[in-house]
């Protein structure tokens, strides 16, 4: 097993963990259908930027 050469301080532990935070998804509401969707993604009904791009 690997063994550290010296103890890491609380400060170094915190600096390492500073990048571990989770972010919420960026959601948008489509202008045409009023449906909530992820940014830069087609809605479930096939709309993108107010236009129908996928026919079901």
From Swiss-Prot:
Pfam families per record: Ribosomal_L32p
GO CC terms in record: large ribosomal subunit
Chain segments carrying region Disordered: 1-21
GO molecular function: structural constituent of ribosome
InterPro entries: Ribosomal_bL32, Ribosomal_bL32_bact, Ribosomal_zn-bd
Sequence ranges of Basic residues compositional bias: 1-16
One annotated GO biological process: translation
Entry keyword set: Ribonucleoprotein, Ribosomal protein
Protein family membership: Belongs to the bacterial ribosomal protein bL32 family.
Name of this protein: Large ribosomal subunit protein bL32
Organism for this UniProt entry: Vibrio atlanticus (strain LGP32) (Vibrio splendidus (strain Mel32))
Name of the encoding gene: rpmF
């Amino acid at each position: 097993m690997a063994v550290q050469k010296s103890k890491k301080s609380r400060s170094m532990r915190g600096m390492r963990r500073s990048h571990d935070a989770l972010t919420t998804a960026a959601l948008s509401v489509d202008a045409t259908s009023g449906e909530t969707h992820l940014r830069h993604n087609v809605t479930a009904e096939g709309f993108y930027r107010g236009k129908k791009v996928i026919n079901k």
